[in-house]
Structure formats: C-alpha cells, structure tokens
C-alpha cells in the first residue's frame, strides 16, 4: 500500500513573469526576452531570473510587432544584448523555479500572453513546466476585485493605492517587478476584505444566537 504523503505546507511563491516577443505566438515568432521575480505575498523578493534569447531558426518578426518595436528603441536595445540560446536558458530557468523554497505560482498581466510563451519554451527546450498547466491572471483578479467589465479591467483603471512607484519600461525585469508588486497589493486587499467578511459573519452569528435565546425566568 502506497504511503500517504504529508500535505505540502510550504508557502506559495508568486513568480511574476514578463515576456517580450516579436509576434503573437511562439514558433512562427520568437521570445526575445523574459524575466521572473519570485515574491512572497508581503512583496519580499526571493530572487530574480532574466535572459535575452536568440531568435528561433526560421522564425520572423510579425509586421505589427516589428513596427511597435521601432517605437521602443531603448527596450529593443536592452533585449538584444548578451543573447543566449533557448536550449541553454530554459533548463536553467526551470531548475531555478524548482529550487524556490515554496510552491511556485505563475502570475502575469495578462497571463494568457506570457504563459503561452513561457509554457511553449519550457516544454520545447526543458521538457517540463514547474507550474504545471496553471497561471494566475492579474487582469482577472482586478476584474473580480473592482467589479468593472473584464475588458475595462486595465491597470490605469485600478485604484492608485494598488500601484507602487515602479517603472513600466517594456524591459522584462522592470515590468515583472512592477506587476508583481501590483499583484501583492491586490492580494493584500483581498485578504483584508476576507477578514472583514469573516468578522461580520461572526458578529451576525452572535447576534442571531442572542436573539434566539429564551428569556430569563422571572422570580415568583
């Protein structure tokens, strides 16, 4: 009989990840640069990983993305220096994630874009994903917290106190830090709301029990 494993009591580690690419999908196009910042819920940074990648053989930039990169000369220059081949980088990245002292959770804004790229590259060049199939989308979290329509759940519409004074430069490491701090602030608000609701529920139960108690007997 198989021995039952003890529950994993390690904390969740939020791996905020930003991808810079030259097109909408991997394969026909290439991931140019990516970065991850591993954070605890209180914004403690446990480590970072970043790399600039050589383009895929036979791939080419999408015309729309190529035109956009021409408007971002500093970010383009930053992601085209010290290039490494994906075959070397992705196994190293997966091992870095697996070495974190907790349960890694991939987070991004929007996760649908960044996780598509990272999952494809991890499976293609490392053969596994330390995140499984799952990613946490910060945009969806904002949609749930604000009650705004999903397509209007954009960073600019979020409350000012969710934003730390960090730059968003389209340089992967900068953007991973910025969105990671945003997520942690949103998570803190979620936890505060949960605590308040729990306190309200407890008060409601106490009031209900008090109202249903029989009246004290009167002396003869």
Residue ranges and their predicted role:
Residues 55-58, 66-70, 136-177:
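Active-site-proximal helix-loop-helix substrate-binding element of RNase H-like nuclease domains
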Residues 31-35, 122-126, 190:
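Glycine-rich, phosphate-binding/catalytic loops in enzymes
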């Amino acid at each position: 009989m198989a021995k039952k494993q003890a529950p994993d009591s390690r904390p969740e580690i939020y791996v905020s990840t930003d991808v810079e690419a030259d097109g909408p999908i991997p394969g026909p196009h290439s991931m140019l640069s990516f970065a991850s910042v591993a954070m605890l819920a209180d914004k403690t940074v446990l480590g970072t990983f970043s790399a600039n990648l050589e383009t895929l053989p036979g791939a080419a930039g999408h015309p729309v993305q190529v035109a956009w990169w021409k408007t971002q000369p500093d970010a383009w220059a930053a992601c085209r220096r010290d290039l490494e081949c994906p075959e070397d980088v992705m196994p190293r990245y997966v091992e870095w994630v697996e070495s974190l002292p907790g349960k890694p959770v991939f987070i991004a804004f929007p996760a649908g874009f960044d996780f598509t790229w990272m999952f494809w590259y991890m499976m293609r060049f490392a053969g596994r994903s330390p995140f499984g199939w799952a990613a946490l989308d910060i945009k969806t979290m904002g949609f749930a917290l604000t009650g705004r329509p999903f397509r209007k759940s954009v960073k600019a519409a979020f409350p000012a106190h969710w934003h730390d004074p960090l730059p968003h430069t389209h340089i992967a490491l900068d953007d991973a830090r910025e969105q990671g701090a945003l997520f942690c602030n949103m998570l803190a608000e979620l936890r505060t709301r949960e605590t308040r609701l729990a306190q309200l529920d407890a008060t409601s139960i106490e009031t209900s029990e008090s109202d249903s108690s029989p009246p004290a007997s009167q002396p003869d």
